[in-house]
Amino acid sequence: MVQVEKGHVAVVFLNDPERRNPLSPEMALSLLQALDDLEADPGVRAVVLTGRGKAFSAGADLAFLERVTELGAEENYRHSLSLMRLFHRVYTYPKPTVAAVNGPAVAGGAGLALACDLVVMDEEARLGYTEVKIGFVAALVSVILVRAVGEKAAKDLLLTGRLVEAREAKALGLVNRIAPPGKALEEAKALAEEVAKNAPTSLRLTKELLLALPGMGLEDGFRLAALANAWVRETGDLKEGIRAFFEKRPPRF
């Protein structure tokens, strides 16, 4: 269900283009396995997520939707947990992640893009959290959406279920950069390469801080930051970075 191009920057393709790359249970499991494999590979410094074909991800699997109301509570909960694990895994992934939104990103597909650290969106693409339009609720997405855009903007997006174009998505803070038509993957890879040049330890620690700080008070946040500042000074990456600075050469992390 996914294809992986390995390298310094790995690219993970949602690979079900005929069905617009839905987040089926099989797709979620394939993505989780791919992310596990890439985390274990020390040669991979960053990961790009994108979709094959004309869509990033259309969200729910239509075949699954047709029978979802007939499933029992246990099976529905099991499916919800698989999506929860996927969103949590991407959102807390130790290596930098960049979503290349090459086409429509709808419902869970839009949530998957948002879970990445950075998002590059094709200027002709649209995204939205459309669950309420068919009686669903964007429950898992809401956890990270409200952190990304704030309560009022999250309510606007989730209660209307409207689709937004790239320019508005950037203004809201849903995406970081807008790419010319057909260039989302190219620009996402370039952005990932830029990030991947930096110290891996610093990148991982920065991500951990940004995850922890929103749930902390001011004093606790500063204390955690001070600990991180002290800890990083003992790492090999910092020693190499300082050495390279004084030797006037690029660091070799």
UniProtKB/Swiss-Prot annotation:
Signal peptide positions on this chain: none
Enzyme Commission code(s) on record: 4.2.1.17
Broad EC category: lyase
CDD domains: crotonase-like
Catalytic site positions: 131
BP term (GO), one: fatty acid metabolic process
Covalent S-S links between cysteines: none
Keyword Ribonucleoprotein (UniProt): no
Keywords: Fatty acid metabolism, Lipid metabolism, Lyase
Family assignment from sequence similarity: Belongs to the enoyl-CoA hydratase/isomerase family.
PANTHER family, per the entry: ENOYL-COA HYDRATASE (PTHR42964), POLYKETIDE BIOSYNTHESIS ENOYL-COA HYDRATASE PKSH-RELATED (PTHR42964:SF1)
Protein name: Putative enoyl-CoA hydratase
Organism whose genome encodes this protein: Thermus thermophilus (strain ATCC 27634 / DSM 579 / HB8)
